Structure formats: C-alpha cells, structure tokens
Amino acid sequence: MAEEFMIPEANFVWKLGEIIPVARDGTDTAGLRVALRHLRNNGVIGVFPEGGIKEPRGWVHPFLEGAGAMIAQTKARVLLAIVDDTPQKDEMSKALTERSFSTVEFVDLITFPEKSTGKEITSELRRRIAETTHWPLVN
C-alpha cells in the first residue's frame, strides 16, 4: 500500500493484514523485494495497478507495469477483482471511517502463459477490467 495512505491511526490494521508499504516514487525497492519473496513462497498480495486513486472514477486508467512484471517473474496466479463505490474523500482517515456500500467483485482466477511478459499481462488485466465493468479506457 502506498506509504502516504498508511495513516498511523490504523497501524493495527496494517500490522494485522501484513500490509507492505510502498514508496510510489520508485526510490525504495524494499516493498517490491518483500512482495516478490512473498509470491515465491505461494503468498498472496493485493495490488491496485493504477498506482493510486485516479479521477474520474468509473474509467479504467493506465496501469503501471509493476504488477505485470511481478506476475511474469513469479508466475503467480491472479484473482482479478474490482473494488467499486468506495467513499470519495480527500483524507484516508475519513474514507476508512465513513459508512459506505462498497463492493468487491471477483471476476476470474487467471493463470498467464509461461512466456507472458509484464506488459502483456498488464494489458490483458486492463482489458478484462474494462470488459467486465463497461468502463471506458483512459489513454
């Protein structure tokens, strides 16, 4: 999870969920190393491939290639899920504490072909989300 969203008031949640802090500026590879090690040990991680909360909602924004690269490198299976109707707040603490009717839709469990590249995986995941949600693609 992006370090800036990991508010101290919720430290017990981050520890309980074994949430991996990620520096989104690309200067810290510790989170990536932990995630790769976890995947190689048959662990599970959750990734938001857009690299943050993007506006407008209801559109499929470009994905960063990190998720696809991790999948290609570790051969991990992907449980494609869509999170929707979350609170739209400027602060994480407000979003976490506001009552909502958020949904999580589990779309498919995907095993990519052995030779798939990170870019191919990223493109396919993005296509599948757009196909499932009927949301337009942002280029």
Language-model region placement:
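Non-catalytic C-terminal accessory region of glycerolipid acyltransferases
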Residues: 30-139
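Catalytic core of membrane glycerolipid acyltransferases/transacylases, capturing the structured
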Residues: 1-27, 34
